[in-house]
Amino acid sequence: MKYALRGITAEELSYTMNRIKMDKDTKFEIKPQFSRTVRRVQENDKLWFLALEVKVESTDDSPKPFNVKARLVGVFEAEDVNDDVDKQDLVINMTEIVYPYLRAAVSALTANSFINPLILPVIPAGTMFPEDRGEAPSNLN
């Protein structure tokens, strides 16, 4: 299997400050929520799109000083993707390629909002999503 990144686009980048009352020494638990969508172009079966998204949202139960949402889309060209194992490997590899760009976008977005930058953790390839770890059936087209 051969694949190559052809481009990355920021489909959505948003930051919203939440004006919440807090003590000076309050610590917030920031738990980013990740999601991923994979599409294959039917007219050109070599073309793949991977959308990787992260959200940090304030709730009544878990208030946060801000909301962040970032979604990047990577465009890939891939050949010799012959079976489900190849597809799963390709999806994991595409995720591994796009994720550092997502980390950088979130850090820049929060830093440019004049707060301490949110730095997403380094996550090893194949462990970000349950289906990559074999914990749930994958639904890839």
Residue map of PLM features:
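N-terminal intrinsically disordered, cationic/polar leader segments
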Residues: 1-97, 104-141
